Amino acid sequence: MPLEPGDPAPPVTAATQKGERVTVDFEDPTVLFFYPADATPGCTTEANQFDRELETYRDAGVAVYGVSTDDVDSHAAFADEEDLGVTLLADPDAKIAEAFGVEVEEGRAARTTFVCAGGQICGLYEGVRPDGHARNV
């Protein structure tokens, strides 16, 4: 069961598609979107739409991270293929998904998005349709 609004947002340390380790403490406004797999149709749509909205999010002071159970190499290939600027976090052991209570089935995280700020969950979107989701958050 996913964490809910009002729950503390667990800090995350993970590698990006560039192989850099980042730590996100969720004190600042942050969107964390979990998606099942790199380079699949729905996930490609969702990642591209978050990427297109990235400047709007940044202008509002909101960081955006995509998370899947794919590894850094997969994220790098996906980001290069799609020319993505959005930061993708590798979660090959599903530890981030587990910390947020995101269901992982057959090695793939359920499509779930969290809006966080002040170290807590402020919003939760589950079972979303990829098309238009980035704009609706």
Give the predicted meaning of each segment:
Residues 1-137:
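Chalcogenol-based redox active-site neighborhoods
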